[in-house]
């Protein structure tokens, strides 16, 4: 039977949510991002290698993030994009996925797998919508790379497991404090027993988290109501508890994902707790970090060395020296080409740096 990992805490401070940002490609920057472009951004021709075929596409590069014109995705990747002028919404469909971008808000709202997700805002310029390429395409089932020597962005369609991911949700009743937890359920996989085991575990985890979150915000709402009653000039925003998942790896009979649970109980901002799970779909069991690292006996040293190199290169500013990952219970998830080790906000970093993530390529464990 699978058991959830205990939540780790390095300090007494609890992790707080940071605004999600698209992972940057190593392309020169030209300006600061402006969602609905009030100033013209430089549109450049960028060479892409799409499943081995080279093509030049319109691109905007801002502060290390590459934005791609959505219109070019219709012919180049076979994705279907359309724009609804009435709702000011862009719809991107392909690989059994749909993403909706709501351009009516000052900062673009993204909806994926029936969930609202957060990322760098889209740019609208000269009638064309530009999206952060990595943020968009990794969610649509593509691997992204960058060849600095050739100055070429690589896009490869990922050969995924033959299954379907469905979004289920747990929602509070009318008149109750806001609870909305999304969680994935797998269907169509060949091994139905393993699939049922994974689904039961994910459902149980979501139910437990939703119940605990509901209790937490109910207590907070009661305290907030009392505080407002004592001070008529005080207004505290409504409390809430949300869970949003992202499948990060669906290959080679493995499934990896994380759920970000966000709790707002009043104050300047809320708290996020990330729970990651990696499954062997042939057994329905969770994989350990060492399992994911190809069983390497020295996996801790390999990961520590990679993290330290990334820190030396300025990836994050740790508030205390990094010594080693937690050998007993280190948080991680998989992506197309790497194991991603992560730490909670305030575990090593200040709030503004969000959840520190350190990708370690699979090739490091060969």
Regions found by a protein language model. Give the residues of each.
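Glycan-recognition/cleft segments
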Residues: 97-104
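N-terminal functional modules and adjacent low-complexity/disordered segments of proteins
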Residues: 14, 18-22, 45, 98, ...
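Sec-dependent N-terminal signal peptides of Gram-positive bacterial secreted proteins and lipoproteins
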Residues: 2-38
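Active-site beta-strand termini and strand-to-loop segments that position acidic
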Residues: 92-96
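Compositionally biased intrinsically disordered regions enriched in Thr/Gly
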Residues: 3, 33-90, 105-108, 112-366
